[in-house]
Amino acid sequence: VPGLKITLLQQPLVWMDGPANLRHFDRQLEGITGRDVIVLPEMFTSGFAMEAAASSLAQDDVVNWMTAKAQQCNALIAGSVALQTESGSVNRFLLVEPGGTVHFYDKRHLFRMADEHLHYKAGNARVIVEWRGWRILPLVCYDLRFPVWSRNLNDYDLALYVANWPAPRSLHWQALLTARAIENQAYVAGCNRVGSDGNGCHYRGDSRVINPQGEIIATADAHQATRIDAELSMMALRDADEFRLW
C-alpha cells in the first residue's frame, strides 16, 4: 500500500457566513495537487455556532462544493459542517471522494459546556472510511476526550480529528492527540482552526500529524493561517503492530 499524503488546512473561519467561507477555501485549495486527503476544520462553513444549522447552507450545496474540490485536487476532501436534517441539526463530518461518493460521521460527544447538546443531535455510530488502501476513522473535536470511542480494534490506520478547540485548553489538545496515537498504535491527525469567533473564543490551531509511536511528524505554528503536509507510511504502522494492545 502506498503512503498516504495528507494536508491539513489550519485557517480562520468567517462567523456564520457559508458563502464567504467557501470562497476562502476556494483560494486555499487552488493549485493543491498530489495529495490523497485534504482536511478542513470543524464547522468550516460557520464557525462553532449553536444556531449555525438553522441558517446553514444545505447539505447538497456543501457536498456539491466538496465534490468539485475533490475532483479539482484528486483527493478526499474532509471537514465538518452544521447541517439541518430531517431528524434534527447535526455536526456532520463529511468526507467526499473525487468520484462523488460521500461518507459522513455525526459527532458523537457534544460539548455540553457550550450547550451543543441542546442544539444538535448526537450521532451514535462509528464510521470507517476506506480510501486508497487506508482505513480512516473520522472524529470531531470533543470526541478526543473519550478514548473508548476511538479504541482501535485493528479496524483503522488513521484517526482524523477536526476541531474548533479553544486556545486556553490547547495543552489538552496536544497531549490527547499524542495519547490517542500511542494507545491505539495508529496515525492521528488533528486539524484545528485559528482566529476568533463570534462568541469571543480564540483558537491557536496547533494542527498536527502524529505517528503510531507518538512522534509529531508535522505541526502548524500556533495562531498562523497555514497548511501542513505529511506522508503516512504503512511500514510504520506494521512496525507498531508487533505489539498490538487490544
Label the model's feature ranges.
Residues 84-154, 168-175, 233-246:
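Active-site catalytic loop in hydrolytic enzyme cores
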Residues 18, 23-98, 103, 167-180, ...:
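Cys-nucleophile CN-hydrolase/nitrilase-fold catalytic domain and related Cys-dependent amidase chemistry
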Residues 46, 94, 105-111, 208, ...:
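Short beta->alpha transition motifs characteristic of CBS
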Residues 10-15:
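Short polar catalytic/cofactor-binding loops
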Residues 1-8:
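Extreme N-terminal starter segment of soluble prokaryotic enzymes
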Residues 36-37, 136, 158:
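Structural motif
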Residues 60-78, 145-225:
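CN hydrolase (nitrilase-like) catalytic-core segments centered on the catalytic cysteine
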Residues 7, 94-96, 103, 208, ...:
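Conserved hydrophobic/aromatic positions in well-ordered beta-strands
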